[in-house]
Amino acid sequence: PGHPPGIDTPNPQWFWTLLQRNQMPARLLSKEDIETITAIKRFSDEYSAINFINLTPNNIGELAQFYFANLVLKYCDHSQYFINGLTAIVVGSRRPRDPAAVLAWIDRTINGAADVEPAAQEVLQRLGSNPAAWTGTFTSTNMVRYVMDQRPMVVIGLSISKYNGSAGNNRVFQAGNWNGLNGGKNVCPLMAFDRTRRFVLACPRVGFTCEAGGFGTGVRENTLSEQVRGIVSEGGPMVQTAVFAAVLHALGARTQHLAVDDWIGLVDDEFLAASLDALNATVVDQFGEWSVEAAQELVKNMEAQTTAGAVAAGEGAFDFGACVGDTPQQSTSAFNGGLAMAAAPAGQKRSLPDDILFDMGAPPEKKSGLTFDML
């Protein structure tokens, strides 16, 4: 059931979106599928109820790390405020594959337009001896300990700012991206978009990484990466179709040269990147050769198949909202359309009979500020 129309590879985004919208036909789910869905939903609800980490885990390792930290916080009576999280920005490099990306490194005479592509191909073949032509990459991960073990140099990015203290003196300094307890207008506003997130830079070599942008201008460049991240955050049954269409509109024929690493850099998700990379191969398989028109036609066909693949009138759909029971029998009742155990209100922990040590009631509303004891 995890295969979207027209695609041979499973797509978790499509699968879970249909489940959450109650559009997944019940006939496609086996008893084992129902039990797995029930266990995942129950764990997700319980994790959300005790979560005080304002970051979304990207893999099983990060989920285990965050879950263990939340259990420690719960045992220590932590409440109200999200804790600070540390994210590693890993700097790397890769070989460019698009001939247009290496035009600046062509070192032979060009007599006409027909000489450009062969000259660019020569540069691509000699990339091993020309590291300056490689493309810089940036990926983020919350598994900071793994990064510290694997990378030869890790830099903590800090900004130092002087501001007036509560006693009126001007000799108080702060480091990092603290934002103050009550707004702190005199505190350095760098990286104030997220008060609970800290960053480290992991660099494989010493050199210039990125330029600091101007602050306070009120102008934000609408880049392709931001458009793609917005599409991914909005969700939907066919996110890869919308992302592929946006990239195709922006890059045109260069889309066919994008590799998996390029897609990962855009969407920051390996599964979605693999699905997007497969779309280029699908264009060639269905139309014989890659072209912008063929890619647009494929996107149009996939969107039409997705719309037609919704649950038809009168067909039983799996009730995801009722899938919160603690036993397989309750899962089966949800599959059959019966009413399973009702979920607790949002943000409130459901009491379980075997949860005695950590049965501490519902946490209060979580705030993104900082407390005195945290400082």
From Swiss-Prot:
InterPro entries: DBP_sf (IPR035989), Viral_ssDBP_head (IPR043031), Viral_ssDNA-bd (IPR000635). Keywords: DNA replication, DNA-binding, Host nucleus. GO terms for biological process: DNA replication. Gene3D superfamilies: 1.10.150.560, Viral ssDNA binding protein, head domain (1.20.190.40). Signal peptide: none annotated. GO terms for cellular component: host cell nucleus. Single-stranded DNA-binding protein required for DNA replication. This is Major DNA-binding protein. It comes from Equine herpesvirus 1 (strain HVS25A) (EHV-1).
